[in-house]
A protein has these predicted regions:
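Extracytoplasmic soluble-region selector
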Residues: 1-233
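Feature marking well-ordered beta-strand scaffolds used for ligand recognition
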Residues: 130, 177-182, 193, 199, ...
Length: 617
């Protein structure tokens, strides 16, 4: 028996569970749970969000306000109400939209429970006498984004810049590759589907003829746009498969051989919930890939495997070691047929290493899901830690880190993505053309592996940020962070859980104002790891196989619904660890092929075929 006293500090209101576990000398344990109810703090203030203080008659203006409590927490659970002191001049509906009726001065009051805030507003006579609308293109594909140009004009034909404009669209979907007189016998009478923003950006999900309408100040104008199928579908063909029957497969890496193995290609895969094995493969002839060596360490799971850019050093992670000293293992992979252990490194990494990354003689290793350590491996036999990066938010945790051009991108669940300078080359030393411009490199130059410097971050409102990949669009002037979800929900009446979520495209072109603009989400299952090459996303989708997605051009709306999915494939094997099922973990494009690790059955190599378009989704 014993007593342990703890102090708990609450950072959010709601139900809180505290679990205590006591382990016995023979490996058993007992546990108990205490449920606490943390009440909401009193409300403190209401803040208008970028409000319009000058408005025009005949317009509708949206207002937004945020409520904060005494703990300075944003309270999205509190309902706010808007009103004016003169409904004859301007009046709100219940959604926070203000209708301006006549010129004058009035006061807007926003209230929540026992607090309120006021805003003085002036309405002016509306000078708009007409409205024009034009489209930059008459015909686009599904998924293509266009910006409509709406111009409110005064009596002299001069543009009025600060008048609000609302946009809408209508149309009928056409499910055919061929339009005859802008109609098709395959049309089934469904309405056309797409997205239009408050700025007039439009993207279609279904083919058809769309009528886009702009409205302002009692005037309206229309533009018509024909939308045709995107036609990017291709087929996936199996090139080779290496079956793993004994254990669940985790992640993979592929690389080119060096030294006497120059001209050959190799891969490594880990194992999960097994006995600490990593398999090395010769994939020079991918149709006859074979395991050529095995490394076994004290671990239940070798979750992550990485190879250095020069093809000489390998890193495998360890979780579930018998002595609880996990850490990572440094390997000499110069001869993949005879891989040797150079060093076991577990200094302050005993909580388990889930993911690692190698960049320029340093390993970025996750430590117990709380931080990443930066470890110098310039001499692989004598590694040493040079720094760590850890968030300071309550209850923080980390799942992954990726390093590119000296910028580290970490995925931190609810805290989202953190972008850190660990030795970035300032952009002025590189090409600044749109195919290579990363705005974070324009901010780089102060950080190093021994002195990581945070550049930016964006939280994840869903709390599911599991993996992040930086994407410099090769066909637009955009820089995106592609943030992958990982979460599972229970199936009613069953103990089974099914993965959910997808990929969120965060436009970081303006690093001070990142915006989520698009999402790719498959209806039947959730995402895992992903990779980008050119303007194509390759994704592992657990039970949904691998997915290949066209991410060219500006990205807006529901990418799955827009027919951007190029192909998908489910690798099933009757001799796998789990027979005739698929569960894709990671995917890497390499030398024109797509390699992926299936949790249930091993390593695959596939390729895209049929260059000619086959139609839409």
């Amino acid at each position: 028996t014993g007593v342990s006293e703890i102090t708990v500090q609450a950072y959010k209101s709601g139900k809180l569970s505290i679990r205590a576990i006591a382990r016995g000398l023979k490996g058993g344990f007992v546990s108990g749970v205490l449920e606490l109810d943390v009440p909401n703090p009193p409300l403190d203030r209401i803040v208008f969000v970028d409000p319009d203080k000058k408005v025009y008659t005949g317009t509708n203006v949206s207002y937004e306000a945020q409520v904060f409590d005494k703990a300075n927490l944003l309270r999205e659970d509190v309902e706010v109400n808007f009103s004016t002191n003169n409904n004859k001049t301007a009046e709100f509906d219940r959604f926070g939209n203000l209708t301006v009726k006549k010129p004058g001065k009035f006061v807007i009051t926003v209230s929540a429970e026992d607090i309120d805030e006021e805003l003085k507003v002036q309405s002016k006579k509306n000078p708009v006498k007409s409205l024009t609308l034009s489209s930059p293109k008459n015909e686009i594909r599904t998924g293509d984004v266009i910006k409509l140009d709406a111009s409110p004009l005064d009596s002299r034909g001069r543009a009025v810049k600060d008048v609000p404009i609302s946009y809408s669209y209508s149309g009928q979907a056409v499910y055919s590759d061929v339009f005859i007189n802008n109609k098709s016998s395959e049309s089934v009478g469904l309405p056309a589907s797409g997205t239009i923003t408050n700025e007039g950006k439009f993207v279609a999900e279904t083919p058809g003829v769309y009528t886009i309408t702009a409205q302002s100040s009692g005037y309206s104008a229309i533009a018509k746009v024909k939308v045709v199928p995107r036609n990017v579908k291709r087929r996936i063909e199996v090139v080779g498969h290496g079956t793993v029957t004994d254990h669940h497969t985790s992640d993979l890496w592929v690389w080119a051989g060096v030294g006497k193995h120059k001209g050959k290609d190799f891969a490594v895969t880990g194992t999960h919930s097994a006995d600490g094995e990593a398999y090395f493969w010769d994939i020079t002839n991918p149709s006859k890939m074979t395991i050529i060596d095995t490394i076994k360490v004290d671990a239940r799971t070798v979750n992550d495997v990485k190879i250095s850019e020069d093809g000489r050093v390998g890193i495998i992670s360890r979780e579930g070691a018998s002595n609880r000293k996990n850490g990572l293992v440094i390997l000499d992979v110069t001869d993949p047929y005879n891989v040797t252990i150079t060093k076991m490194y577990d200094d302050d990494l005993t909580g388990g290493v889930h993911n690692v990354f190698i960049y320029q003689d340093h390993v970025y290793a996750l430590s117990a899901g709380t931080r990443y350590d930066i470890i110098n491996i310039s001499d692989p036999a004598n590694p040493f830690r040079v720094s760590s990066y850890e968030l300071d938010t309550p209850g923080h945790s980390i799942h992954d880190v990726w390093v590119e051009n000296g910028i580290a991108y970490s995925s931190n669940w609810a805290d989202g993505v953190h972008i850190v300078d660990v030795g970035g080359i300032p952009q002025r030393e590189q090409s600044r053309d749109k195919s290579s411009f990363n705005p974070f490199l324009a901010m780089a130059g102060k950080g190093s592996p021994g002195n990581p410097v945070k550049l930016a971050s964006k939280s994840d409102p869903n709390g599911h940020n599991h993996a992040t990949f930086p994407f410099v669009s090769q066909s637009s002037d955009r820089f995106y962070m592609i943030n992958g979800d990982e979460w599972a929900k229970s199936i009613p009446g069953s103990a089974e859980r099914i993965y959910q979520g997808g990929f969120h495209f965060i436009d970081f072109t303006d690093v001070n104002n990142p915006q989520e603009t698009a999402i790719y989400q498959v209806p039947e299952v959730g995402s895992h790891n992903h990779w980008v090459e050119g303007d194509i996303l390759y994704a592992g989708y657990y039970y949904g196989g691998i997915r290949v997605l066209d991410i060219s051009g500006e990205l807006l709306g529901d990418l799955y619904a827009q027919g951007r999915e190029i192909a998908f494939f489910e690798g099933r094997d009757p001799n796998g660890k789990i027979a005739n099922e698929t569960n894709v973990w990671g995917v890497i494009p390499y030398k024109g092929l797509i390699y992926f690790a299936d949790h249930y059955n091993g390593l695959w190599a596939v390729k895209l075929v049929d260059e000619e378009p086959l139609g839409t989704n």
